Swiss-Prot record:
Hexamer. It comes from Homarus americanus (American lobster). Does not bind copper. GO terms for molecular function: oxidoreductase activity. Residues 1-23 form the signal peptide. The keyword Cell membrane does not apply. This is Pseudohemocyanin-1. Pfam families: Hemocyanin_C, Hemocyanin_M, Hemocyanin_N. Residues 7-32 are annotated as: Disordered. PROSITE patterns: HEMOCYANIN_2 (PS00210), TYROSINASE_2 (PS00498). The gene is phc-1. Keywords: Glycoprotein, Signal. Glycans are attached at residues 100, 193, 230, 626.
């Protein structure tokens, strides 16, 4: 119950005394209250609300009478209400895909409404009202996006999607076991296996693509950087296209490193006119019972009805290749826009994903989004047997399919062609005068292992409307997840200047050898580098021993607390028992911190560990940059904090690696990552 609202008919019907709460939001409503409300909106998503005050608000709130303070004077609300009135919205208990233009536009209507809200009573009123009116999955996408971008909810933590919509992350077999346990009233914990069998070589790395934390990272990144976003939603997102390049480049490189750890050949990039060798059966179902489509091995890529023809994809690709070769793209007015510069990667990324800022959408098309839909429908390109979207058409599930990595290896190759057209960095550009790296080493073991992880299937089960949260039966899934033991980077840096210097410390690694044991040349290795950390540090004159713990990495984030934990913490804060302190979980766009390093193997996989120390004053866009990047590696609310390109200084070709070896502010060493088949069972 809402303690602060005990004296009111509705928690938002009048003024309240929030004494004892931290007024950390623009409208003075405490974060604990907002976290409580969001928790209950998402609890039992597919059922009516289970919280009395919110249910009362649902019955009394009229969106049309709460538009006075909206900047658009209620235009967005009126438009969405018209869709409700004419019953044009997607029906409930149906699938939703952001790649479906009609469904996406419905979601954006709600996003616009929620972002127009200037106070919490209006925001939660609209969120409650439209919860019962809209398709559940459309609603979740819109709600998560609005919470991520609204200044009203800057301290609210989004619950993990694998607990809100468990069907997307949990095998049908485990869901069926959970249903049976629910029917007989028996709590249960059910072990879930990865997709496929030992007969499929790709099964060896299913732990990576099917990692629920990695999938959470991916969808959270797309929520933070939606391809449809423009400034009418509140602000412009900087370097959107470049961020698109980098997050996918890193996923491809990390997938390649995992393949080497498991003695698998490198990814073959997609070719539209060749066969797609890897099939995929996701073994998952939608909440309504429909199965995700599967795909056989060795299929010839066909035209897909109502999506695109293969030749359309080739035309799009060739136009992008021509732009890269010429060094410019064409905008809608026919003007040439130069891309042979540090900002070109941003324009190219906008074009490939077909973002709103794409200079000429009609000409360059939508290679990325259309590619997902084309490959997703290859199991049934003419819709003879089903019309449900595949795993490739949901951010929650797309990383599971090997075709995702083939598509993005193909796209990554286009980005590399562009980057290789740029002039290599000169010694003058790379040098940080007076700064030298004396030594790099790792303190602690570079060793990975698997550990069981348990997450709730509560939202997958149906309950009576009067069921209280505390009365829910404990039913959960258990899945092994890759982790690593604690370690620290230690870098000895000499500052030969007479004053403190702000330094950007950039740490990367790439496989020293390919799967055949051949040493990667520097120029090839640097393109396959995975980013391990980037942070800012003041270097005092003389010798500096810089220590950075693995869990401090700006590339990664910790696991978001479970929905149950968020509920308990919010209720305790509202009751005055404890303070709500969830700051470290607010930004969830980073990789899971347990996946910082690749798996390795029993013999040890060699990696070249490289550290570049660059001029922090020249790099930063913010005087407080060293204090603000801990949890916002990809930037925050549209602002990216590092002026340098993603991957700098390894993002451009290196004709002669001796240049890097001779620069004192660049250092390298060889390390080994081990995995001894250790599996920690926590839930026996």
């Amino acid at each position: 119950s809402l303690v602060v609202a005990a004296a009111a008919a509705s928690p938002y019907s009048g003024s309240h005394d929030f004494s004892g709460f931290q007024r950390d939001e623009p409208d003075g409503v405490p974060t604990a209250q907002k976290q409580h409300d969001i928790n209950f909106l998402l609890h039992k998503l597919y059922e009516p609300l289970h919280e009395a005050n919110l249910k009362a608000l649902e019955d009394s709130f009229d969106p049309l009478t709460h538009t006075a303070n909206m900047p658009d004077a209620g235009v967005a609300v009126n438009k969405l209400m018209q869709e409700v009135k004419t019953q044009h919205l997607e029906e409930r208990h149906h699938w939703f895909s952001v790649f479906n233009a009609t469904q996406r536009e419905e979601a954006l209507l709600l996003v616009k409404v929620l972002l127009q809200c200037q106070d919490w009573p209006t925001a939660i009123g609209n969120a409650v009202y439209f919860r019962k009116m809209m398709n559940e999955e459309t609603y979740v996408y819109a709600l998560y996006t609005a919470i991520k971008h609204s200044p009203l909810t800057k301290h609210v933590v989004l619950p993990p999607l694998y607990e809100i919509m468990p069907h997307f992350f949990t095998s049908s077999e485990v869901i069926q076991q959970a249903y049976r346990a629910k029917m007989i009233g028996q709590p249960g914990k059910f072990n879930m296996n990865f997709t496929g069998t030992q007969n499929n070589p790709e099964h060896k790395i299913a732990y990576f693509g099917e990692d629920i934390g990695l999938s959470t990272h991916y969808i959270n990144w797309h929520i933070e950087y939606p391809f449809w976003w423009n400034e009418t939603f509140g602000y412009q997102i900087e370097r959107r296209g470049e961020n698109y390049f980098w997050v996918h480049h890193q996923l491809v490189n990390r997938f390649e490193a995992e393949r080497i750890s498991n003695h698998l050949q490198k990814i073959e990039k997609l070719h539209w006119e060749r066969n797609l060798h890897e099939g995929f059966d996701p073994h998952t179902s939608y909440k309504n019972g429909e199965h995700f489509p599967f795909r056989h091995d060795d299929i010839h890529i066909e035209d897909v009805d109502k999506v695109a023809e293969v030749r359309d994809m080739i035309v799009m690709e060739n136009r992008i290749r021509d732009a890269i070769a010429h060094g410019y793209v064409i905008d809608k007015e026919g003007n040439k826009v130069d891309i042979n510069n540090e900002h070109g990667i941003d324009i190219l990324g906008e074009i490939i994903e077909s973002c709103v800022y794409n200079p000429y959408n009609e000409y360059y098309g939508s290679l990325h989004n259309m590619g997902h839909m084309m490959l997703g429908h290859q199991g049934d390109p003419h819709a003879k047997y089903y019309d449900t979207p595949s795993v490739l058409e949901h951010y929650e599930t797309t990383l599971r399919d090997p075709a995702f990595y083939k598509l993005h290896k193909y796209i990554d190759d286009l980005f590399r062609k562009h980057k290789d057209h740029l002039k290599p960095y000169s010694r003058k550009e790379l040098l940080f005068p007076g700064i030298a790296i004396n030594n790099i080493h790792i303190d602690g073991p570079l060793e990975t292992y698997f550990e069981d992880y348990e997450y709730s299937l509560m939202n997958a089960m149906d309950d009576k409307e009067e069921m209280k949260w505390e009365d829910n039966m404990e039913i959960s899934a258990i899945i092994p997840r890759l982790r690593h033991k604690d370690f620290s980077f230690k870098v000895n840096i000499m500052n030969n200047n007479d004053e403190n210097k702000l330094a950007t410390i950039r740490i990367f690694a790439w496989p020293h050898r390919d799967v055949n044991g051949v040493i990667m040349p520097f120029n090839e290795g640097r393109w396959h580098a995975i980013e391990l950390d980037k942070f800012w540090k003041y270097l005092a004159p003389g010798e500096n021993e810089v220590t950075r713990k693995c869990d401090e990495s700006s590339v990664t984030v910790p696991d978001v607390p479970s929905l149950k934990s968020l509920h308990e913490q919010a209720e305790a804060a509202i009751a005055g028992i404890s303070e709500l302190n969830l700051e470290e979980f607010v930004s969830a766009t980073g990789l899971p911190n347990r996946l910082l390093i690749p798996k390795g193997n029993a013999a040890g996989v060699e990696f070249k560990l490289v550290v570049a120390v660059t001029d922090g004053e020249a790099d930063s866009v913010n005087d407080e940059i060293n204090l603000t990047t801990k949890f916002h590696h990809y930037g925050h609310h549209g602002v990216y904090l590092d002026k340098k390109s993603h991957g700098y200084p390894l993002d451009r070709r290196v004709p002669d690696e001796r240049l890097f070896h001779e620069i004192p502010n660049f250092g390298e060493t060889i390390v080994k990552v081990f995995n001894h088949n250790e599996h920690v069972h926590r839930h026996e």
